[in-house]
Amino acid sequence: IIQYPKLSTISLSLPGIVDAGKISSTYISGVENENIEERLKQRYKQQIKLYNDINVAAMGYYVTHSENKNLFFLFQAISLNAGAGIIVNGKLIEGFCHLAGEVSYLPLELSQKQEELSKTPEGTLEIVSKIILTTMYLVAPEVIVIFSELLPDFKVLEEKTKELMSQHQIPKLIKVNNVIEYMLVGQMYLCLKEVD
């Protein structure tokens, strides 16, 4: 930061619920329910902006693919709970207390605990397909973007989704292999938008 004296804002994207400077429901040890924003403000003179990591990924995807005004960005990593970012009419939906997109709290009827299912391709398919089904009946985005290392055969997911939604048209399903690039773009976009 010393090398960049004109830097006016420090921005972080973090896993979990980011609300009023506090982080909750995160797997990062030592920050649960801590007011990270206040701690950083005490140390740095720059503005501090904190965002949920998958919300910024959703915004990054939207900014680079703006033809999709309504999208759902689903992140399902190995051995972790799922998270999502929601864009409706070109706007990021964070919801009350920034809970929108916390899909790991959905009362899905799963065959095992989500943490266990997320360790195998079959389990991941079960989680992702049921989240897609729920999403379609709640938000109905035209595009669902998915990051998951354990879904190598995307055709199987498309078939499972068609099976679950046999009476309705399914959205366009898009697999991304790198979520970091979308996080970076989305974080820069949101940060610049707030600073202006």
What does each of the following model-derived ranges do?
Residues I1-N70, V156-S166:
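Glycine-rich phosphate-binding loop and adjoining helix at the ATP-binding site
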Residues I1-T9, R43, T64, L92, ...:
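ATP-binding/phosphotransfer module of carbohydrate and carboxylate kinases, centering on a glycine-rich
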Residues L14, L74-L80, F147-E149, I174:
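Short secondary-structure boundary segments
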Residues L14-P15, I23, I54, A82-G85, ...:
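Long, contiguous hydrophobic alpha-helical segments, chiefly transmembrane helices and signal peptides
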Residues I17, N55, I78, K91, ...:
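Short, glycine/serine-rich, charged loops/turns that create anion-binding
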Residues G21, T26, G101-L106, S148:
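Flexible, active-site-adjacent loop/turn segments at secondary-structure boundaries
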Residues K69-E115:
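Glycine-rich phosphate-binding loop of actin/hexokinase-like ATP-binding domains
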